[in-house]
A protein has these predicted regions:
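Noncatalytic, solvent-exposed loop/strand surfaces
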Residues: 17-409
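N-terminal signal peptide c-region/cleavage motif recognized by signal peptidases
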Residues: 13-15
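Positively charged n-region of N-terminal signal peptides that target proteins for export
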Residues: 1-5
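Hydrophobic alpha-helical targeting segments used for export or membrane insertion
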Residues: 6-10
Length: 409
């Protein structure tokens, strides 16, 4: 992402509609595509690719879809610029590019990037977060890529492991909720989407953690949930007031929790390994645990069963209420991206650019296909209107390049 960001043509994007994929893990925060979507199960460079677009820089954020606009964050690591690209959803043409920050890049893990947090949108504005100069900064852009406001949210200075920042922001009504967990300072805050002003804030345990906050309607109320820091924590998303916290898991998790009517499920991490089901009513009841580690990935819940793909590329299915293992199947690792559910079909990409397609069938593992695009895939795909948007990379070092694919019939 070089100075071309400052000169690309700016066009107008349309407003949001019901089919948008407006934030990390989709409009409902569960990585489940809207009902009725029908995405190809097989593709290649020459099959079922509607278009492909070059993405400047490097990033692991997922595509965000707002009407006819696709948004990606990215970073030029050599030039130390972080910014946002807008693409035409119909053609893949780049419509605009905006630099949000320059300089101050921290050290990061080689599997992380300086643009790993996924953008979110309320249909009026786009919201992004970046880590630089020992802080987390949030910015709001209009749908033409013009910056509306920028706000320093809080410090982020990891000490023990300098692996960078990854938590994606989420929206609740007129607030943008952002978390920053490190072993020197840790917080979760809500910002006014119109001004960037802090509406509420809460301190969190000073521990290394990379999970994203998510708002869920569970156990009869709206709850802001974050895993990691050796707990699952719940807050009132309107005020930030702590509702409950349950000791479990381990210090560091990266995945986002999933939930059903009354239970929250999470997995991680480092240094211990655990997958856990916790009642979301504050009772402290842990329904079940096991020793599986889905560290980078978030899980799926569908028809009373949990589906997951762990770091090593093993797919799992558990009964949600009992934790009973229904099956496990080795695919191929390593895996960082999270699986996405389309109807009763799961799509799971590994770090080598292979996407495995299999049924969400609790009775047995039912493989459908495996597809290859590029040589690297860390970003979780998104699905809107029968099209899957997949961010992949090819090459290494100075020859590495990223591509955004639109896959559909």
């Amino acid at each position: 992402m070089r100075t071309i960001l400052l000169t690309v043509l700016i066009l107008t994007a349309s407003s949001t509609h019901a089919a948008d994929w407006s934030q990390w893990r989709g409009p409902n925060g569960n990585n489940v595509a809207a009902a009725g979507n029908n995405v190809p199960t097989e593709w290649s460079e020459t099959q079922d690719v509607i278009w492909k677009a070059k993405v400047l820089g490097r990033g692991h954020s997922s595509p965000t879809v707002i009407g006819d606009l696709i948004v990606l964050t990215s970073a030029d690591e050599q030039g130390q610029q972080q910014g946002v690209f807008g693409f035409d959803r119909r053609t893949g043409d780049q419509k605009w590019g905006t630099v949000v920050s320059k300089g101050g890049f921290p050290k990061t893990h080689n599997k992380n990037t300086h643009a790993s947090a996924t953008a979110c949108s309320d249909g009026r504005q786009i919201y992004v977060t970046f880590n630089h100069h020992n802080k987390v900064e949030a910015a709001a852009l209009d749908l033409q890529g013009k910056i509306v406001w920028q706000q320093d949210v809080g410090g982020f200075v990891p000490r023990q492991y300098q692996y960078g920042y990854a938590a994606s922001p989420t929206l609740y009504k007129n607030t943008l909720i952002i978390s920053g967990d490190s072993d020197t300072v840790a917080w979760v805050k809500a910002l006014d989407t119109r001004s960037g002003r802090v509406v509420w804030q809460q301190n969190r345990p000073q521990k290394l953690n990379w999970s994203s906050p998510i708002v869920a309607n569970v156990a009869g109320k709206e709850q802001l949930l974050i895993s990691g820091c050796e707990q699952i924590a719940s807050y009132d998303p309107a005020t930030g007031r702590p509702l409950w916290s349950q000791p479990c898991l381990t210090m560091a998790t990266c995945g986002t929790v999933v939930w059903d009517n009354d239970t929250v499920y999470a997995s991680g991490g480092y240094p211990k390994k655990e997958t856990v089901a916790v009642k979301a009513d504050g009772s402290g009841q842990i329904l079940w645990t096991n020793g599986t580690k889905c560290y980078e990935q978030s899980m799926l819940i569908h028809d009373g069963h949990i589906y997951a793909v762990d770091d090593n590329g093993i797919a799992w299915c558990w009964h949600a209420k009992t934790g009973q293992e229904k099956w496990k199947q080795r695919l191929q690792g390593p895996v960082s991206a999270s699986p996405v559910l389309v109807g009763d079909t799961i799509y799971a990409s590994n770090e080598r650019g292979t996407t495995f397609v299999f049924k969400a069938n609790p009775q047995r593992f039912e493989a459908i296909a495996r597809n290859q695009l590029g040589t690297e895939s860390f970003a979780t795909p998104t699905v809107v209107d029968n099209v899957m948007y997949l961010r992949v990379a090819s090459g290494q070092g100075g020859g590495r390049s990223e591509t955004l694919y639109a896959i559909g019939n």
